[in-house]
A protein has these predicted regions:
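A cross-family phosphate/adenosyl-ligand binding-site feature
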Residues: 1-119, 123-185
């Protein structure tokens, strides 16, 4: 059974996290553990962007960004999926350079060293050469860089619909099943 870590950096794009968590709860039969790490800045951004910060409604284990006693700080805990959404370029840089100075970068390091699924949903734009090289390094190490770029062939009508095109893709990349629009065959 899947054990999932959702990490929330301080980048703008809290709606992506909210939609992901809502969808993960809707497919609970596909996972046995959901653990969430939210940085202090992510809490502020969430409140600013969404007007709320009630994370307690999600059936999950919550960890502070410096809690290195979290089970997924060790590879022996067998967490097999980590989604960082949104993933700031600062977080990308720390992961790419092996700096395990907080729980998010430590967990990502563990996921990569154990050859498990790391998905970094980057939202910032444009990219400079340092960003591109850091994303390349993570990709070469086995991670997946998934820009938060909505698709429009499904004709989304709302921001939430557009966000769902990205989130559904992330869920699919994680190896989980979700009903979503796909290109007609």
């Amino acid at each position: 059974m899947n054990k999932i870590i959702v990490a929330v950096s301080g980048a703008s794009g809290s709606i992506y996290t909210k939609v992901l968590l809502d969808k993960l709860i809707s497919i609970k039969s596909q996972w046995s553990d959901l653990s969430i790490v939210i940085t202090d800045n992510a809490k502020l951004v969430w409140k600013t962007e969404l007007g709320e910060n009630d994370f307690n409604k999600y059936e999950a284990h919550f960890y502070e960004k410096n809690d290195f006693n979290a089970p997924f700080a060790s590879g022996s805990a067998n967490y097999n999926i980590m989604i960082i959404i949104p993933c700031s370029m600062g977080t990308i840089g720390r992961i790419a350079n092996g700096l395990s100075n907080d729980l998010i970068s430590r967990a990502a390091d563990v996921i990569l060293k154990e050859s498990r699924k790391l998905i970094c949903v980057v939202r910032e734009t444009p990219y400079n050469l340092i960003h591109i090289r850091n994303m390349e390094t993570i990709t070469q190490a086995g991670g997946i860089i998934c820009p938060a770029s909505p698709s429009f062939y499904s004709k989304p009508k709302t921001i939430e619909d557009a966000v769902a095109t990205v989130v559904d893709r992330v869920i699919s990349l994680a190896g989980l099943k979700i009903d979503s629009y796909s290109w007609p065959e």
